[in-house]
Amino acid sequence: MSNDTIIISSYNDFDNLAHSPSGTACIIPLLVLNNDLFKLQDVLGCYNPAFILKHPIEKILYICCESIYQGNILTVTYDKFYNFKLLGNVKTGKSTCYLQLDFELENLLVVNYLDSEISIHPLDDDIPQESIFNLPSNVISNDRKNHLIDRQSESHNHSLVLYKTKSYQDIAFVPDLGLDLIRIFNYQKNELIPVNTYQLEKNSGPRYISVLMDHIYVVNELNSTVIVLKVIEIDIINLEEIQIISTIPEDYTGYNTCGNICIDNTRKYLIVSNRGHNSLAVYQIDNFKLNLLSIKD
C-alpha cells in the first residue's frame, strides 16, 4: 500500500454499537482513496469496521468488526488495484475496538470495549487463543440502553500500546475508560502479566495513547483533555504526570468527546480530534510538553 493511499471505514449498523454515532449509517463500509482511485469496497462478513490495522510488511489488513453481541476480526489481503480478498474471520467478543501487532510481528493483541477483555491471536495459527486477561471483578457488560446512561459503571478497556523499556522489556499500557485508569502489563510471549495501574482524575475516560520516547500521551474522551505522562522505569513500571491540557476552547460549553490522538512523523506535533466541537486540536511538542497551536473546525 503506497503512502498516499487512505482506507476509510464507516459504521453500517448503529443498533448493535455500545455508543451512538452522529450522522447516518452507510451501505458499503469501506472506501479506498488515492490520487487515482475512489473505490467503495465490501468484504464478506464486514460490518461496523471500527478499526483497521495494516501489516507493516505483508499486503494484509486486520479489520475489527464491532458489535455489542459478538465482534470479529477479518484478515484481508489486497492486490495492486486494491481488490480485497478475505483470508480469515475469527470471533473476538463484545465490542472489539482496538488491534495492535507485537514488536516481533508474531501476535495480534485485541481489546474488547464492552466486556473489557484482552486477547492474543497468533498470526500463524488458525485457532485464536482465548482471552488472556480477565478482570478480577466480573464485568457485567450492561445492555446498550443502560451503558449509554452511564459509561463508567464498570471497566471498559479501550486500546493497547506496546512500549519497550531500556532493558528491552515489553510493556503494555491499556487505558480503561470505565474506571479512569491506565493498566500496566509485562508482555511476555503470549501472556500479559499485570504489574501496576495508574489512576487518573474521575470522569476522565482515557481512550487512546500515543508514545514518544519515554513519555506517553493519553487522550481523555470524557473530559476533553490530554495528559502527558513520563514512564518511570524502576523495579515496577510506573507513570508520572507532567501536564494536563484541554482539547477545546475555554469558553466552549457544549457537548464534546475526544476521538483519536496521533503524533506526526516529525515528532514535533500532536493532534487530537474533538467530536461535538467538531475540530482538531493541534499542539507543538516542546521538551515533551504540549503548547496549543490551534483548534480548527
Positions of PLM-derived features:
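Conserved beta-strand positions in repeat-built beta-propeller and related beta-rich domains
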Residues: 8-19, 63-67, 110-113, 174-177, ...
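Blade-loop segments of beta-propeller domains
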Residues: 38-105
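Beta-rich, blade/repeat-based domains predominating
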Residues: 16, 46-56, 92-103, 107, ...
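Loop-centered beta-sheet repeat module
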Residues: 171-226
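Short loop/turn segments immediately following beta-strands, especially the blade-tip
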Residues: 28-35, 75-82, 121-132, 186-191, ...
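A short beta-strand motif characteristic of beta-propeller blades
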Residues: 38-45, 85-90, 138, 143-151, ...
